Amino acid sequence: MNTSFTRKSHTFLPKLFFRKMSSSGAKEKPELQFPFLQDEDTVATLHECKTLFILRGLPGSGKSTLARLILEKYHDGTKMVSADAYKIIPGSRADFSEAYKRLDEDLAGYCRRDIRVLVLDDTNHERERLDQLFEMADQYQYQVVLVEPKTAWRLDCAQLKEKNQWQLSADDLKKLKPGLEKDFLPLYFGWFLTKKSSETLRKAGQVFLEELGNHKAFKKELRHFISGDEPKEKLELVSYFGKRPPGVLHCTTKFCDYGKAAGAEEYAQQEVVKRSYGKAFKLSISALFVTPKTAGAQVVLTDQELQLWPSDLDKPSASEGLPPGSRAHVTLGCAADVQPVQTGLDLLDILQQVKGGSQGEAVGELPRGKLYSLGKGRWMLSLTKKMEVKAIFTGYYGKGKPVPIHGSRKGGAMQICTII
């Protein structure tokens, strides 16, 4: 017997019955096993983030059930925007351009209010539509979690014909199916820090840059940061590393380029990646480092976190002889014309030198730990006490290009920033 509840079947059931069914059923049904529903650490961590859950799937596949469960789990501070409420029939967006305009205005309104958990319930089968949503997430600094039903019939058009509330035919459903058959891969996967953890780490990085810039040992090495034509008395490192990530910080695991990068699909298909998607983790920061090109934080991965670290990242010669996961880092800033990928390479360069027996010269103590000069304008602050930061494992789906970053409650554009 089919125990799923479509809009048609649960309309006449008491709300109390549905609430009882959904909360208990979520623990038992395999199709409802998602970390953001089952794992209490993840639920608590998501309350500290701004997350846009984008549901994808054919009509009748179980999206609305998932949407209601997310609303129920997160209570206050949660809003759902459903295409159904705008009388949008799944199919061509061109037929409902005005309805989608109203939907997007309402969604953006919730973003401006800093609603912690937003749920968008629609088929979301078109790449162009998803790109619009990802751009909005960038503008309002929301992390994205794509959610697709795990029901056995999610791609079975014959069954979905009977389940969907719009009475779409099997042929109608088949037209929507191609955009939903393959996993939608991000620009990259990674751990995305909560807002509080991002602010804490960003502040620690800024303080380090200020302390380093004022340190007498650093002032003697300014030639690595300033050309010969410039004055060499002092350098404002916070301004020097002006290319900084807006919003939440992150630690990249796998660069996917939306599925075009080597090994991207294989990585995304790993059971541990699927199981961990949308789950909370606690990352450990052991050191802060600066080179003439980048500023970053070294991340020490646990055995559990290393399962999400792609093996191909440890193949380049820069990683040779180093433990798996040595490249794990959070980019705090880049110098002009430097790409964020350089941060990990700079860290590997430092670690190779340390492995070779040259930890550098200890030049003093800072409030958070011991400062080392490694030559060539490279500096590392070894933290006396490791920093623990909370993060969600998910993907970044935007374009990674400059976008107008909107203020939240005050509204309006604040600045143009690049997602890095």
Curated annotation (Swiss-Prot):
Entry keyword annotation includes DNA repair: no
Record's catalysed reaction(s): a nucleoside 2',3'-cyclic phosphate + H2O = a nucleoside 2'-phosphate + H(+)
Active site feature: H250, H329
Biological process, per Gene Ontology: adult locomotory behavior; axonogenesis; cyclic nucleotide catabolic process; oligodendrocyte differentiation; response to toxic substance
Annotated positions binding substrate: T252, T331
Localization in the cell: Membrane; Melanosome
Residues annotated with Phosphotyrosine modification: Y110
Prodomain positions: 418-420
Enzyme Commission designation: 3.1.4.37
GO molecular function, one term: RNA binding
UniProt cross-references to Pfam families, sorted A to Z: AAA_33, CNPase
GO cellular component: cytoplasm; extracellular space; melanosome; membrane; myelin sheath
Membrane topology according to the record: Lipid-anchor
Modified sites of kind Phosphoserine: S9, S169, S227, S239, S358
InterPro entries: CNPase, CNPase_cat, Cyclic_Pdiesterase, P-loop_NTPase
Chain positions with Cysteine methyl ester modification: C417
SUPFAM superfamilies: LigT-like, P-loop containing nucleoside triphosphate hydrolases
Keywords, alphabetical: Hydrolase, Lipoprotein, Membrane, Methylation, Phosphoprotein, Prenylation, RNA-binding
Keyword Chaperone carried by entry: no
S-farnesyl cysteine lipid sites: C417
Function: Catalyzes the formation of 2'-nucleotide products from 2',3'-cyclic substrates. May participate in RNA metabolism in the myelinating cell, CNP is the third most abundant protein in central nervous system myelin.
Family under the similarity heading: Belongs to the 2H phosphoesterase superfamily. CNPase family.
The protein's assembly and partners: Exists as monomers and homodimers.
Name recorded for this polypeptide: 2',3'-cyclic-nucleotide 3'-phosphodiesterase
Organism: Mus musculus
